[in-house]
Amino acid sequence: DGEQVVFDTNAEAQGHDFFRIGGMDISKDGRWMLYGTDTSGDERYDFRIRSLETGKELPEVFKGIGGACFTPDAQWVFYVKLDDAWRPYAVMRHRVGTPVTDDVEVYHEQDERFWVGIGLSFDERNLVIGTGSKTTTEVLLLSTDDPEGEFRAFIPREQDVEYDVSFSRFEGAGERGEDIPLAVVYHNALNPNFEIDVIDMRSHEPPYRLGEGVRVAVGSPYGCEYGDEVEPGASGMPIGTPYSNPCNPAILQGAHGLGIEGISIHRHYVALQYRAESLTHIAVMTKDAAAEDFLAGRPWKFTELVPHALEDDWDVDESVDEINEERAEVWGALDQLAAAQGEGSAVHGVSRKAMTSSDGATADAMPGETRRLYSIGVGGNPSYDAPRMRYSFSSYTRPGELHDIDPATGEDRLLKRATVLGGFEPREYMERRVWVTARDGERIPVSLVWRRDVPACDSAMFVTGYGAYEISSDPGF
């Protein structure tokens, strides 16, 4: 009755100077737990199988491995071996209840640049081996109905091409009411900022090819090293050049600096994650609408997810005069910084035209300024069948929040908000993003945060930033 504690780390750690969990998998029937522990700190894990009914463990122990997973029926364990350099390089198959000395190697990665992983697909219909280097990836599949079969490449490896694949289906959308099995491929073979293709797997058995299927979303090639392969002259254009593509949903048309970051297709909804104007975005639509667009061969009709709480703040809390006053403070601070750093600074030459030409009649964001300034991301949605989607968001002045939303109705519920001690009040702080032009002509986003009652032009400024390896300094509390 009620909740059951399946693993108490504090109790398990008794008698060990070091103790760390290295992964956990619960069988689909809830009877068995596969878990790994490291008691020496060397990041090699010993995995064991424990009965959740009796608490007893099976005799087999998988020593010094990198990770492991059950098949859905918990009759088999697949796990990853490590070499002397701690590289995951091989996948082993184990029948539960037999000696580990009888285990069989089912995959061996010979190229030392590549690391190997094993897991189940989201729909639990396939075992998935993922192998990848810094610039190249490959996915191999094996049906969970045939665990003793041979893994096959879903798409053969191509040097300097990264791809990932997930699986879903359009329930009852076939001509005879059958399900349409889908492979959702995320790759950069044809576009440096990635694209998403959805393949109807009824067409043929794997292997497939990169670019096959229906293109759902395509990133911008502008300012990218290989952009000219997509569009002549694209690599020499500024990253923020507006990008349009007939395959893209309407909400992506004309986006600045568009990068595609992923998609998830659940039973009731589809969620697209992308980046534009250097900020993260989520777009959602119902599964039924996605199936209709897919079968009709037209762009999918996504709607951007905007947290209702933020919409309320923008629309109600600030008058036009207040917003224009804030703008004057922001640009005054930038003028001060530019004067201090001289003509060669990145902030020198920022245009004030939008502010000085404004007649104060509207509260719209001026060119070069971003009113939307927060991070948003999909997370915590492990169930394929759940009708609601969880997402999180945060900004420089708003503690992190966890919400769930019904994509069909738009009903948004706050589940949790981070607590800040000391009487913190978000409305006492302001945040804005402006764009400054660097010496090479590229536009750079600058986020500004300050207390409303602190004079922006006469106060000290703390400056920090980072930008490399496609790692962004996203807004966060």
Task: Give residue spans per PLM region.
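Beta-strand C-termini and the immediately following turn/loop, strongest in propeller blades
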Residues: D1, I26-G41, F78-A85, R95, ...
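Short loop/turn segments that connect beta-strands within beta-propeller blades
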Residues: L52-G55, R95-P99, S143-P147, M201-H204, ...
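Beta-propeller fold detector
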Residues: G2-N10, L58-F62, D102-Y107, E150-I155, ...
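Well-ordered mid-protein domain cores that form the structural environment of catalytic cofactors
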Residues: G2-K56
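Conserved beta-propeller blade repeats
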Residues: A13-G36, F62-V80, D111-G130, A153, ...
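A flexible loop/linker signature enriched in serine peptidases of the S9 family
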Residues: E12-F18, T37-D46, V61-K63, F70, ...
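Serine-hydrolase catalytic core recognition
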Residues: E175-E178, Y226-P242, E318-R352, T356-F477
